[in-house]
Regions:
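Conserved small/polar residues in nucleotide/adenosyl-binding loops
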Residues: 252-254
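Cap/lid segment of the alpha/beta-hydrolase catalytic domain
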Residues: 115-208
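N-terminal targeting or regulatory segments adjacent to alpha/beta-hydrolase or S9 domains
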Residues: 1-81, 89, 94
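Glycine-rich active-site/cofactor-binding loop and its immediate structural neighborhood
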Residues: 75-133
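Gly/Ala-rich beta-loop-alpha elbow adjacent to hydrolase catalytic centers
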Residues: 232-236, 240
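Short, hydrophobic alpha-helix immediately C-terminal to the catalytic nucleophile
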Residues: 96, 241-242
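Alpha/beta-hydrolase fold nucleophile elbow
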Residues: 223-232
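Alpha-helix C-terminal capping segments
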Residues: 242-249
Length: 254
C-alpha cells in the first residue's frame, strides 16, 4: 500500500548503474586470452591469477599454521560420522566446520567435496543437514540447502565450513542469542565495510579460507585429492567460482 502522504513523487532518478555499465564497456575484457599455444595459455593463466588475487586483496592475507582442533564427533543414524573441526585460517582467525564422513565402501581413499554455504542458511548448519534445528530444517526444505549431507549419503566426504560472517563466525552485530533472523543471516555486509578501506574484499577473504581448507585436506591426507571437488549455492557458488579460477588443486566445481 502506497503512502503518498508521507513522501514526494520523484519524477526522474539519477542512478549510477548506467555510468558503471559504460565504464565496464570501456575497461572490461582487456586481459582476455589471445594466444594459441599451451605455453601462452599457461603464462596467461598465471598472470591472470595474480591479477585476480590482487583485486581480491589476497596480498593482505596472512598465512599461518592451520592448527586443526577436533571439538566434537557425532555418529549419525545413517552411519555418517560428523566431526566438528576448528581451523586457523589466518593468525587468530578461526573457521569452524563440519566434516561428514560416510562409511567406506572399499579400501580406496574416499572422494571429497568442499560444500561451501550461501546466505539464509545459518552457514554450515544447513549444508551439513542439521534438521534437528527447526529454523535450519525450514531453510533446507525451502532451498534444498543440505547438499553436504546429500553428498555424504552418496559416499563422498563433505567438508562444510562456516565462511566469514556466517554461522559461528557472525560478528557482534548479529550475535543475538536465540534471535532466529540473526542466526540464519550473516554479517558479511559489516565485514565488507571494514574490508574495503583496507583494500580487502569479502569474496577475497572467503576464497582465501577455502584455499586454506584445501590445504587442510592435503595435510590430513585421508581422502582422495585427485578429484577434489567444490560445490556451493548462492554465496557458496560465488566462492566456488573464484576458487576454480585461483588454483588447480580442486578439479570439480558445481
Amino acid at each position: 500500500m502506497e503512502q503518498a502522504d508521507t513522501i514526494i513523487q520523484i519524477p526522474h532518478f539519477y542512478g549510477s548503474l548506467k555510468g558503471m555499465q559504460d565504464k565496464f564497456d570501456k575497461y572490461a575484457r582487456q586481459d582476455a586470452f589471445t594466444g594459441s599455444t599451451r605455453e601462452e595459455w599457461e603464462a596467461w593463466k598465471e598472470t591472470s591469477r595474480e591479477t585476480l588475487k590482487d583485486l581480491l586483496g589476497w596480498k593482505y592475507m596472512e598465512t599461518c599454521d592451520l592448527a586443526p582442533r577436533v571439538e566434537e564427533v557425532v555418529e549419525l543414524e545413517n552411519g555418517i560420522r560428523r566431526e566438528k573441526v576448528i581451523l586457523q585460517v589466518e593468525p587468530e582467525v578461526y573457521m569452524p566446520m563440519y566434516i561428514l564422513i560416510p562409511p567406506k565402501q572399499s579400501e580406496e581413499k574416499q572422494k571429497c567435496f568442499l560444500a561451501l554455504p550461501g546466505h539464509q542458511g545459518a552457514g554450515k548448519f544447513s549444508v551439513a543437514g542439521r534438521n534437528d534445528i527447526p529454523a535450519v530444517k525450514r531453510m533446507i526444505e525451502f532451498y534444498h540447502y543440505d547438499y553436504g549431507m546429500q553428498l555424504a549419503k552418496r559416499g563422498y566426504v563433505a567438508i562444510c565450513p562456516d565462511c566469514r560472517g556466517f554461522g559461528e563466525r557472525r560478528d557482534e552485530a548479529l550475535q543475538k542469542g536465540t534471535d532466529e533472523k540473526s542466526f540464519l543471516t550473516s554479517t558479511c555486509f559489516h565485514l565488507a565495510h571494514m574490508a574495503e578501506p583496507l583494500g580487502e574484499t569479502v569474496a577475497g577473504m572467503c576464497t582465501w579460507d577455502a584455499s586454506r581448507l584445501i590445504d587442510y585436506v592435503y595435510e590430513r591426507g585421508e581422502w582422495d585429492t585427485d578429484d577434489l571437488g567444490v560445490v556451493g549455492f548462492s554465496g557458496g557458488g560465488m566462492q566456488t567460482l573464484w576458487i576454480s579460477a585461483l588454483d588447480d588443486l580442486s578439479l570439480i566445481h558445481i
